[in-house]
């Protein structure tokens, strides 16, 4: 009777479900074998259930430890950190290990040198000697990498506002503009043209000439045309009181230029640090010479096809050290003479184009009457003419205003200019 009931119950199930629920081998077993099989499955289920529970407990324990470690990490990574420099990275086999691992030696700002067998939470492969890192003040493990440090005086040399000067703002310097474009602008904007010919562009340019002839103005216009970072260094700024301070400024300036590239470094008044070397027992003279040697080293330290160009300006090329002028450093020398008559007329027109000028102003005659004027003095003529027109209550500048302006500037102009190193 029981067999009939079982068969009836089995026939009421779908064929696929019946095969999934009861394997064929079960029907070939005796009742004792079925009971024994059921007990084995029940024991196996209990074992799996206990393993499942233990795994859950183990997972909860791991999650708890992860949370505790994250909390500790968050506490330990809170500022402030100690600042340290990476001194050395060592590959060595630690106790209990078979494979070599990377260890780090750091020098903290507290003047301690620390060996870290386990560096910390940063990627050691990305660390380099000299890198700046933040370390925990208690365990000294490395928590973060810091950006490179530059002298604050060097950062102040970077001109944040992009130069707005254009070549059209410069008069009488067409040849000089062409030479500067070939030496500085083209290598930065059309590098492939030099590569196709197979020549290397010059590293730097030396502009020399009397004051007020447009050297700084042309350097700013050049930086504006290349859309590059513009670092302006003055020679007297690099002469510092402490030994090695000026050389560090030069070193940091070139390091900042490499990071911010493409960059134009403009060194004004180069004769302040670039004078010919001589024997001296005065420590100040030796420090100036050390600064110049660092400048020579930095000029040799980057290739001519790098995105760094050096433009130097001086009034006294005759007192510069020959090592600065040799090929491979400041290759191109561009002279800025006093403007001729045609150039003076062009400069006067440029500086007066935004003024309300009468049509009877003869710039050619003004150019003839302003012989030996430089560009800055010609600009002063236009300013003086405007002040004279204001003084007489006029609304536009007439020719006589410019003539009186020339007389005013001529009266202030020194007859002889002497420069001392």
Swiss-Prot record:
Superkingdom to which the source organism belongs: Eukaryota
Annotated positions binding ATP: 209-216
Cell location: Cytoplasm; Nucleus
UniProt-recorded Gene Ontology molecular function terms: ATP binding; ATP hydrolysis activity; proteasome-activating activity
Keywords tagged on the record: ATP-binding, Cytoplasm, Nucleotide-binding, Nucleus, Proteasome
SUPFAM superfamilies named among the record's database cross-references: P-loop containing nucleoside triphosphate hydrolases (SSF52540)
Pfam families: AAA, AAA_lid_3, Prot_ATP_ID_OB_C
Gene Ontology CC terms, in alphabetical order: nucleus; phagocytic vesicle; proteasome regulatory particle, base subcomplex
Gene Ontology process terms (BP): proteasome-mediated ubiquitin-dependent protein catabolic process
Quaternary structure note: May form a heterodimer with a related family member.
Its biological purpose: The 26S proteasome is involved in the ATP-dependent degradation of ubiquitinated proteins. The regulatory (or ATPase) complex confers ATP dependency and substrate specificity to the 26S complex.
Membership in a protein family: Belongs to the AAA ATPase family.
Name of the protein described by the UniProt record: 26S proteasome regulatory subunit 6A homolog
Biological source species: Dictyostelium discoideum
């Amino acid at each position: 009777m029981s067999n009939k009931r079982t068969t009836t119950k089995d026939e009421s199930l779908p064929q696929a479900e019946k095969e999934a629920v009861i394997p064929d081998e079960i029907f070939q077993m005796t009742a004792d074998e079925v009971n024994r099989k059921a007990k084995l499955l029940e024991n196996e289920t209990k074992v799996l259930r206990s393993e499942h529970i233990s795994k859950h407990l183990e997972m909860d324990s791991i999650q708890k430890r992860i949370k505790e470690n994250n909390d500790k990490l968050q506490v330990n990574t809170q500022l402030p950190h100690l600042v340290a420099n990476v001194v050395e990275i060592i590959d060595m086999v630690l106790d209990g290990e078979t494979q070599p691992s990377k260890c780090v030696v750091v020098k903290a700002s507290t003047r301690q040198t620390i060996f870290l067998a386990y560096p910390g939470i940063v990627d050691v492969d990305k660390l380099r000697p000299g890198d700046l890192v933040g370390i925990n003040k208690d365990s000294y493990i490395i928590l973060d990498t810091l950006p490179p440090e530059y002298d604050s005086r060097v950062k102040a040399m970077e001109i944040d506002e992009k130069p707005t000067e254009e070549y059209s703002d410069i008069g009488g310097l067409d040849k000089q503009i062409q030479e500067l474009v070939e030496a500085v602008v083209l290598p930065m904007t059309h590098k492939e043209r030099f590569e196709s010919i197979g020549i290397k562009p010059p590293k730097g340019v030396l502009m020399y000439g009397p004051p007020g002839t447009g050297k700084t103005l042309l350097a700013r216009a050049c930086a504006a045309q290349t859309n590059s970072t513009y670092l302006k260094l003055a020679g007297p700024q690099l002469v510092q009181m402490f030994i090695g301070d000026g050389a560090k400024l030069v070193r940091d300036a070139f390091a900042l230029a490499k990071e911010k590239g493409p960059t134009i470094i403009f060194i004004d008044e180069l004769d302040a640090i670039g004078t010919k070397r001589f024997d001296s027992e005065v420590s100040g003279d030796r420090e100036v010479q050390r600064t110049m040697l660092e400048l020579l080293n930095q000029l040799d330290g980057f290739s001519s096809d790098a995105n760094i160009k050096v433009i130097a300006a001086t009034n006294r090329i005759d007192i510069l050290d020959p090592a600065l002028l040799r090929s491979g450093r400041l290759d191109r020398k561009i002279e800025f003479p006093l403007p001729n008559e045609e150039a003076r007329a062009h400069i006067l027109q440029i500086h007066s184009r935004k003024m309300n000028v009468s049509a009877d102003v003869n710039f050619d005659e003004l150019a003839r009457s302003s012989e030996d004027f430089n560009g800055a003095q010609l600009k002063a003529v236009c300013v003086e003419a405007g002040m004279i027109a204001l003084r007489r209550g006029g609304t536009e500048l007439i020719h006589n205003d410019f003539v009186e302006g020339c007389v005013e500037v001529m009266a202030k102009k020194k007859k002889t200019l002497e420069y001392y190193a």
